[in-house]
From Swiss-Prot:
It comes from Rattus norvegicus. GO terms for biological process: calcineurin-mediated signaling; penetration of zona pellucida. Keywords: Calcium, Lipoprotein, Metal-binding, Mitochondrion, Myristate, Repeat. It is found in: Mitochondrion. Ca(2+) 2 binds at residues 63, 65, 67, 69, 74. This is Calcineurin subunit B type 2.
Length: 176
């Protein structure tokens, strides 16, 4: 896994030396097969993630090299986006990327449907969900191109102060 402390300066994360060391210990605990990277199953071993329908999308975003697993560098960079010291724009971009599944800079009708389907499961019929998606696109799509840009997303979500809820705290408690 390398020297965890060097990641702060190398990658410009929002974590200090001690936080990176603590995250390194957490990463090692999660890395059940000791491969040096985290699979979806290893992420799902965390009770707080087991019920999160979007954990797969979060892993996709953390996994910048696209190999299906999250190594320590990807873990630190990804987690840093949720640091209390992280900025609003970074948090909003992360939230936008949850929906922008093809990473083209826009949320399409189909992408919004897929992500909302992950969240609601079978609680809504597909036609009901599609109505919700269509109405959402109509409201959010200010330029009328049929899709939601980051700017359109940001303008709406910023007023909800979602970025203040997208925070992770690194435990400063006693050593294990």
């Amino acid at each position: 896994m390398g020297n965890e402390a060097s990641y702060h300066s190398e990658m410009g994360t929002h974590f200090d030396h001690d936080e990176i060391k603590r995250l390194g210990r957490s990463f090692k605990k999660m890395d059940l097969d000791k491969s040096g990277s985290l699979s979806v199953d290893e992420f799902m071993s965390l009770p707080e993630l087991q019920q999160n329908p979007l954990v797969g999308r979060v892993i996709d975003i953390f996994d910048t090299d696209g190999n299906g697993e999250v190594d320590f560098r990807e873990f630190i960079v990804g987690t840093s986006q949720f640091s209390v010291k992280g900025d609003e724009e970074q948090k909003l971009r992360f939230a936008f990327r949850i929906y922008d599944m093809d990473n083209d800079g826009f949320i399409s009708n189909g992408e919004l449907f897929q992500v909302l389907k992950m969240m609601v499961g079978n609680n809504l019929k597909d036609w009901q969900l599609q109505q919700l998606v269509d109405k959402s696109i109509l409201v959010l799509d200010k330029d009328g191109d049929g899709r939601i840009s980051f700017e359109e997303f940001r303008d709406v979500v910023r007023t909800m102060e979602i970025h203040k809820k997208l925070v992770v705290f690194v435990d400063h408690g006693q050593e294990d």
